Every structure is written in C-alpha cells, then in structure tokens.
C-alpha cells in the first residue's frame, strides 16, 4: 500500500513537471534580439534568461542589440520587463537610447523614453557628460555627416553587419533631436 502511494505521488510529480514546463528558446537571446524574434524573446523571458546579459561584442545587452538592429517590437517587449536596465551601458558607454539617437531610430527613441530611459545619462564614456541630448545637439541636426563620423558609421555597420543608409540616418537624427528636447 505504501509503495503504491509513493509511485502515485512520483507519477503525479513527473506528469505535473512535464506539463507545466515551458518550451525552451531555440536560439540565443542576442540572435533573437537581432532578428526581431519576439516569440523567442518571450521564451527567454518565460525561461528566466538574464535579460541584462552581456554579449561578447562590445558588452551589449539584448536591449542594446535590439536597438542596433532596429527591432522596435523587441525593444518594447524588453523595456516592459521587470529588472531590465534601460540605462545599461556597453563598453563604449552607449545605452540603448544613445544607440537609437546615433542611428536616428525615432520609433525606438519614443519607445525607450516612454519606458523611462534617462535622456540625460552620460553617453560615449567621456568626461563631458555627453548624453543623448548633447549627442543630438552635436550630431543630430546636422545636414550632413562629416568624414570622421561617416567612417565611424561605416566601421560600426561592418562590425554589426548592418546596411548603411546615411541619408536615412541624417533624417532620423534630426527627428531624434526634436524628440529628445521635449
């Protein structure tokens, strides 16, 4: 009788464990952020993945990665999660908001600001506290990109495998300057 009870409890435990487990993500969180795979990001969230994990490349977080690749739906999802650090900086001193500002990604800027990202945070890792507002004042409203900055865009695009559209970036930065002054 005792053995039947133990077997019954064990069987119930196994069945409950199997039924209650959620499927695991099939790709890493950075690839999911890069490709805009909201379903996989949700699996990472449900599975308890570290949403502030650092990538080998520049110590980017999944939020910064999603921003770099223009994945606003992933940015929205991650920015709504408890514990996600909206103002986390990579080794270059960039936050997700800094990245969105530099690349002129107005929708992502609006998403991050609505979620509470700090638009006055120190950016670029310099001593002059060049936050996104300063970044847009220096770069955002320019009608063109100077050769030094253009080279930085080219280098970053190559590093991350991005297509580079300087006209779109310039247009977006002008809008970013307006959004960050509100």
Annotate each language-model stretch with its function.
Residues 31-36, 65-71, 99-105, 131-149:
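Ankyrin repeat A-helix N-terminal signature
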